[in-house]
């Protein structure tokens, strides 16, 4: 695990974005941890969040032309990531996001920001069922662009309804890399290093044994 990944987990815990306990997911599964990126909700939080997304992008080595943030949660993520890439990596990247409802006046259309062209890096908070990615792919393809990859905050590394995770299904269906700032494996490593979280560690390991990929 790299330093920025460890720092991201600490940041998420500090902001209570990442919590350990017992949580019922939409799928009905009882999870020993929960991640709610909506709690990164101040200017300082967003600035820090962008730096972690930018670090993961730089670390990945994936080449892309435009950042795309799907409405709604992806919009501030794309914006802060673009700022962080410029400020901390000297990479001036165009960014774009979509409207849920197309605008019929002014500039019109359902896209805001740069043109959606070339190789697109999609940024979002998490992938659960992959629905948002599929909707975004329709927009990307309609503009004649290609999906270079997807970056999310956390990869839960757990099976969906079949044997694959939602992330693995996206990788299979769209032939692109899906990367994350951290994964469930990183969370487990973090808990092992902490040494004072045996209760949470055992619960997370048991969850991975049951649902992990």
Swiss-Prot record:
Keywords: Glycosyltransferase, Magnesium, Pyrimidine biosynthesis, Transferase. It comes from the Bacteria. Its cofactor is Mg(2+). It catalyses: orotidine 5'-phosphate + diphosphate = orotate + 5-phospho-alpha-D-ribose 1-diphosphate. Transmembrane segments: none annotated. GO terms for molecular function: magnesium ion binding; orotate phosphoribosyltransferase activity. One of its GO terms (cellular component) is cytoplasm. CDD domains: PRTases_typeI. Coiled coil: none annotated. 5-phospho-alpha-D-ribose 1-diphosphate binds at residues 26, 72-73, 99-100, 103, 105, 124-132. Pathway: Pyrimidine metabolism; UMP biosynthesis via de novo pathway; UMP from orotate: step 1/2. Its EC number is 2.4.2.10. InterPro entries: OPRT, Or_phspho_trans_dom, PRibTrfase_dom, PRTase-like. Orotate binds at residues 34-35, 128, 156. It is an enzyme of class 2 (transferase). PANTHER family: OROTATE PHOSPHORIBOSYLTRANSFERASE 1-RELATED. Belongs to the purine/pyrimidine phosphoribosyltransferase family. PyrE subfamily. This is Orotate phosphoribosyltransferase. It comes from Vibrio vulnificus (strain YJ016).
